[in-house]
Amino acid sequence: MTTTTDLVSYEDALASYDPVMGLEVHVELGTKTKMFCGCSTALGADPNTQTCPVCLGMPGALPAVNATGVESAIKIGLALNCEIAEWCRFARKNYFYPDMPKNFQTSQYDEPIAFDGYLDVQLEDGETFRVQIERAHMEEDTGKSLHVGGATGRIHGASHSLLDYNRAGIPLIEIVTKPIEGAGERAPEVARAYVRELRELIRALGVSEARMEMGQMRCDVNLSLRPHGREKFGTRSETKNVNSLRSVERAARFEIQRHAAVLNDGGTIIQETRHFHEDTGSTTSGRVKEEAEDYRYFPEPDLVPVAPSRQWVEEIRSGLPELPLVRRNRLREEWGISGNDMQSILNAGALDPIVATIDAGADAASARKWWMGELARSANESGKALDELAITPVQVARVAELVTKGELNDKLARQVILGVLAGEGTPDEVVDKRGLKVVSDEGALTTAVDEAIAGNPGVADKIRGGKVAAAGALVGAVMKATRGQADAARVKELILEKLGVAEG
């Protein structure tokens, strides 16, 4: 077994080999009922309370296809630029494992609902990489195993296992890429970018929340290496059920290094499934990988073929929303920002909050400033996502409005935001409770300016001598005297007027 200490460096691996990837992503569709029966798909129910003879595989139970599941699959296929089959059918994928009570999984084999598509993804530097899609097919999820005892939570070393069949039969769409070649050293980044873009697309379509941490979206990372200049693919490994964007990238990177180490030592790569470990960033062997013939696929005799009419497909196409990449490019042009700026917004999870704040009346620059500034810092400090903060886009827009009206300056606005986050009420309530209003009384400002000049005669002389930049010290003195509640720009104007100096 190759350990992390046996790995060759990533650079050395890429010096000798080209990585070839294949990504299989399973997405749980957000239907109200399961794929082939009427059982609820709601989360949080007691174990084995959302089952029936169909999803438990009882003799004589007959399935029926969930039409919403089919429609969701077509939406995904169209959004991935796939061809939609005029006729497709389900098949039985036969294997024995405790979490599959029927001893077969109802899936699609040689006749998927969608095929031959692509998805363009943007990398960190703004470069676009096209990932070709082999197919997208419908199937059902398995039950859930809970392995009790042992140190890893896996079946090996466990004293016993518990089974919950509530998940068995939940609709899935599996999206399979064609071999991803030509990414070179950026292959792990491409894998991460692809899964991220696919997740955003799924969410935009409204067919799933695609929350990886909850198992609603899972990625299998297939990887092989081949020596430079060789066309034939190497033997692949499949790292199963990777459940975060970061882990997808780390799993691909580790497997590149592991494969290279084995090949450099004259070893042979075994076609197998592997498990990814978050704590170490490494993978370990699972089981020898089956080929399609090992599953003895055959057409599902209890279900008729699915034949979506062209009219229905076009109706679905006409109702598709603006897709994420198109939307981002449009917003980037409207806002006049760079690709790197947009990528930073995406990485922070700030795009939707910013758009919602603009929709609530704020200008784009102000919305970006607050979400990417004070609110991003608060999210990082609290370990929360931006959309988990106790402030709404409407409230952020109100803060921006108060600044625009001159009732708050940036310093006071930050205090208002912190007050809202602390649960002190709406922005207006925080302003009233804390007494956070810009000092707009000219008499009060003039008095504060006179006192600052009188208390700093040396600075005043420098300003009179033409060093306008020195006015910052007097502005600071006034801001301190007014507890930050003065309009700094107006204070500077008054200082220069008092000293008879024109702005540079």
From Swiss-Prot:
Q: What class of enzyme is it?
A: ligase
One Pfam family name is GatB_N
Identify a single GO molecular function assigned to this protein.
asparaginyl-tRNA synthase (glutamine-hydrolyzing) activity
Question: Which reaction(s) does the protein catalyse, per the Swiss-Prot or TrEMBL entry?
Answer: L-glutamyl-tRNA(Gln) + L-glutamine + ATP + H2O = L-glutaminyl-tRNA(Gln) + L-glutamate + ADP + phosphate + H(+); L-aspartyl-tRNA(Asn) + L-glutamine + ATP + H2O = L-asparaginyl-tRNA(Asn) + L-glutamate + ADP + phosphate + 2 H(+)
Describe its partners and assembly state: Heterotrimer of A, B and C subunits.
PANTHER family, from UniProt? GLUTAMYL-TRNA GLN AMIDOTRANSFERASE SUBUNIT B MITOCHONDRIAL AND PROKARYOTIC PET112-RELATED, GLUTAMYL-TRNA(GLN) AMIDOTRANSFERASE SUBUNIT B, MITOCHONDRIAL
Tell me its family.
Answer: Belongs to the GatB/GatE family. GatB subfamily.
Q: What does this protein do?
A: Allows the formation of correctly charged Asn-tRNA(Asn) or Gln-tRNA(Gln) through the transamidation of misacylated Asp-tRNA(Asn) or Glu-tRNA(Gln) in organisms which lack either or both of asparaginyl-tRNA or glutaminyl-tRNA synthetases. The reaction takes place in the presence of glutamine and ATP through an activated phospho-Asp-tRNA(Asn) or phospho-Glu-tRNA(Gln).
- Name used for this protein in its record: Aspartyl/glutamyl-tRNA(Asn/Gln) amidotransferase subunit B
Q: Which organism is it from?
A: Streptomyces coelicolor (strain ATCC BAA-471 / A3(2) / M145)
Q: What is the lineage of its organism?
A: Bacteria, Bacillati, Actinomycetota, Actinomycetes, Kitasatosporales
What is the gene called?
gatB
